[in-house]
Every structure is written in structure tokens, then in C-alpha cells.
Curated annotation (Swiss-Prot):
A GO molecular function held by the record: protein serine/threonine phosphatase activity
Keyword match RNA-binding: no
Residues given in the record as Mn(2+) 2 binding sites: 88, 289, 348
E.C. designation(s): 3.1.3.16
Cofactor binding note: Binds 2 magnesium or manganese ions per subunit.
GO biological process: regulation of intracellular signal transduction
InterPro entries named in the record: PP2C, PP2C_BS, PPM-type-like_dom_sf, PPM-type_phosphatase-like_dom
A Pfam cross-reference name: PP2C
GO cellular component: membrane
Binding site for Mn(2+) 1: 88-89
Entry protein name: Probable protein phosphatase 2C 72
Keywords: Hydrolase, Magnesium, Manganese, Membrane, Metal-binding, Protein phosphatase, Transmembrane, Transmembrane helix
The organism of origin for this protein: Oryza sativa subsp. japonica (Rice)
Domain of life: Eukaryota
Length: 393
């Protein structure tokens, strides 16, 4: 029983750890670890390059992420492309890890069935992932009722046949860097919609969907929340706010609502944008809200534009942490010494993936490049054993 429990805990951290649970410093193919930072400074994709980094703040890393590049179909080798996923969990890592394990396989299955990539394929992959996690919660309800209160934001980008598909639940963000030919500037263009009750239009959407509930959104401690509980209005998981049969005992009382509900309080329907890539589209930044809490869209784009590609995701993480330290009137070097768990009081888990577009391969993928299947994160250090992490100069 103990060994099974240890295996479960180990799986929460992802594949970037060694079998013995020691941090992996080498192996560029699988990424590197340095203290609470995991990073992959550079890699090749079907139609471009990427840089990826994750820094942990929570005691258990709740951000999960992946980059998949190569065949997007199980039956058609000519359907090539890239998927980037950023899954910002809340209440625990289980939902984010489940998405990491299942969404891409669902997407490949539906792409094979439809013989193409489309918004409908992505929507079906989201729905199948949501339904699969519901099944897990239902099967473990009597033993692990707390799974009903775990959820995750879900940001997915798919690059295929000259199109960029952005699908989102929650408040992670995808920001495009687009060149302005006349001036040479690179401007930020946010492609993802955010689902957070802090936005008035999101609150109006909720109120319109629940006209019989005057308390669907509540201002609590100066923060707007759905039923006074959660800021996110769309997610995978959070079954206790979507199905009333899971908002009762044996779920802990702090998650249970006093009144029942007839319709799901949160949605799992992704907002999807289809963007036809242009030669002026330089790169796109995918990141959890841990980055955007500290850096604006344009600041992030400027940083990417004016620095080397190699290690740029790490550089963005550093910039966010520097701002977090500044807000608390402390030195960045001191913030790096704070261990996971306590670190969450200063900043959230942060995941960043930057994809650079190869303009020559936007419409014709470079199939000679090897397939990529990479997951971010994987820090498995014992408490109080940090080593400083480095940032490219």
C-alpha cells in the first residue's frame, strides 16, 4: 500500500524526475532542473522552435504543461502540427495531470475521425477530457471525495496547416507577437479569452445564464467569486460546482453550498479562436496566470523580441519573479531562497512556453524534424534543499 501511495505521489510531478526522485540536471531532451525551476531552453518543432520553463511555488506543483509536435492523427501521417498545453490546476494537481495524460490522445483520435484539424475536433477533445475526469471522480467518490473539488484551467494552442487554434478555459493566456512592417515594432495581440469573475463582462455572462440566482457572483474580501468560492468561471473538473450530486457529504463542508443548484455553476465549454498565420506573426507566448499577474502582454512581447531565443522562457519567469520580489520590497536573490509552499505567498506556480514561427514552414510543415513529446515541470526536491537557479545572460 505504501509503495502504491509513493508511486501516486511521484506521478504528480511528471516525467522530468529520475526513478530515484532525484532532480535531473542533464538530459537536454527531457529538460533540466535547477532548484524549483524546470526548463527546456530550446527545441525544434514541426514549423518552428520553442522555449519552455516552469517554476514551482506551491507545495505540490499544480501547473502541468506539454508540447507535442509531429503527427496529429493516428491514421494520416500527413496531418502534422504542434500542440502546446498549459494546465493551471487549483485545489490540487490531479485535474491538471489528468488533462496532460489524456487531452492530446483525445485530440488525435478526433482528428483521425474527422480527417482534419478543426475547432470542432478541439472542442470534442475538451469534452471527452472533462467527461473522463468526471468518471474518475465518480468512481473514487466514496474513497476520495476531495477530487470533486479539484479543477484546472486549460489553455491549448494547435498549429496546423497554416492555422493557429487557441482554445481556453480559465485565465491562462496566449499572446501573439506581430510585426508592424511600417515601424518594425512587434505588438502584443492577445488571442485567448479569459474566464475570471473579476471581469465585468464575465459576471454579466454568468448572471444572464443564472437569472434566478442573485448570488451567482459575490464580492468577497474585495474579490469577485462564483458563489463566493472561486474566481474561475470555466474549467475542467470542479465537479462539485457542476453536478449537485457531488456537492454533499462526504465532501468536506467547506466546499458544500447551503442551497442546491439545477444548472452547472461553472462551464467546460472552451472559447476557441482560429487565427490564420501571417508572415508578420513572429512568435506566441503561452503562460499560466502566474506570469500575467506580474507582466503585461506588451512587456512580455518586448522581452521576447529583444533577447535571444535560447532560454527566453526562463527569462520571462525571472522577470515575473523580479516583479513579485519588488512588490514585496525584497531582493530577487532572497526570493529564490524561499522554499516551495512558503513561496506561494509571494508568487504562483509559473509556466511559460514560447513558440517561434518558421515563416517558410507555416503552410508546409517540415516533416523531416523529429517528433517532440515533452512535459513541463517535475521538481521532486525534499523541503529545504534548494539550490539557486541560473538564468541565461
Amino acid at each position: 500500500m505504501l509503495s502504491a501511495a509513493m508511486e501516486y505521489l511521484r506521478s504528480c510531478w511528471g516525467p522530468a524526475s529520475s526513478p530515484a526522485g532525484r532532480p535531473r540536471k542533464g538530459s537536454d531532451a527531457a529538460g533540466r532542473q535547477d532548484g524549483l525551476l524546470w526548463y527546456k531552453d530550446a527545441g525544434q518543432l514541426v514549423a518552428g522552435e520553442f522555449s519552455m520553463a516552469v517554476v514551482q511555488a506551491n507545495n505540490l506543483l499544480e501547473d502541468h504543461s506539454q508540447v507535442e509536435s509531429g503527427p496529429l492523427s493516428t491514421t494520416d501521417p500527413n496531418l502534422q502540427g504542434t500542440l502546446v498545453g498549459v494546465y493551471d490546476g487549483h485545489g490540487g494537481p490531479e485535474t491538471a495531470r489528468y488533462i496532460n495524460d489524456h487531452l492530446f490522445n483525445h485530440l488525435r483520435g478526433f482528428a483521425s475521425e474527422h480527417k482534419c484539424m478543426s475547432a470542432d475536433v478541439i472542442r470534442k477533445a475538451f469534452r471527452a477530457t472533462e467527461e473522463g475526469f468526471f468518471s474518475v471522480v465518480s468512481s473514487q467518490w466514496s474513497m476520495r471525495p476531495q477530487l470533486a473539488a479539484v479543477g484546472s484551467c486549460c489553455l491549448v494552442g494547435v498549429i496546423c496547416a497554416g492555422n493557429l487554434y487557441i482554445a481556453n478555459l480559465g485565465d491562462s493566456r496566449a499572446v501573439l507577437g506581430r510585426l508592424v512592417k511600417g515601424t518594425g515594432e512587434v505588438l502584443a495581440m492577445q488571442l485567448s479569452a479569459e474566464h475570471n469573475a473579476s471581469f465585468e463582462e464575465v459576471r454579466r455572462e454568468l448572471q444572464a445564464a443564472h437569472p434566478d440566482d442573485p448570488h451567482i457572483v459575490v464580492l468577497k474580501h474585495n474579490v469577485w467569486r462564483v458563489k463566493g468560492i472561486i474566481q474561475i468561471t470555466r474549467s475542467i473538473g470542479d465537479v462539485y460546482l457542476k453536478k449537485p450530486e457531488f456537492n454533499r457529504e462526504p465532501l468536506h463542508s467547506k466546499f458544500r453550498l447551503q442551497e442546491t443548484f439545477r444548472r452547472p455553476l461553472l462551464s467546460s465549454e472552451p472559447a476557441i479562436v482560429v487565427h490564420q498565420l501571417q508572415t508578420t506573426d513572429q512568435f506566441i507566448i503561452f503562460a499560466s496566470d502566474g506570469l500575467w499577474e506580474h507582466i503585461s502582454n506588451q512587456e512580455a512581447v518586448d522581452l521576447v523580441q529583444h533577447n535571444p531565443r535560447n532560454g527566453i522562457a526562463r527569462r520571462l519567469v525571472k522577470a515575473a519573479m523580479q516583479q513579485a520580489a519588488k512588490k514585496r520590497e525584497m531582493r530577487y536573490s532572497d526570493l529564490k531562497k524561499i522554499d516551495r509552499g512558503v513561496r506561494r505567498h509571494f508568487h504562483d506556480d509559473i509556466t511559460v512556453v514560447v513558440v517561434f514561427f518558421d515563416s517558410n514552414a507555416i503552410t508546409t510543415a517540415n516533416w523531416s524534424r523529429p517528433s517532440v513529446s515533452l512535459r513541463g515541470g517535475g521538481v521532486t526536491l525534499p523541503a529545504n534543499s534548494l539550490a539557486p537557479f541560473s538564468v541565461p545572460t
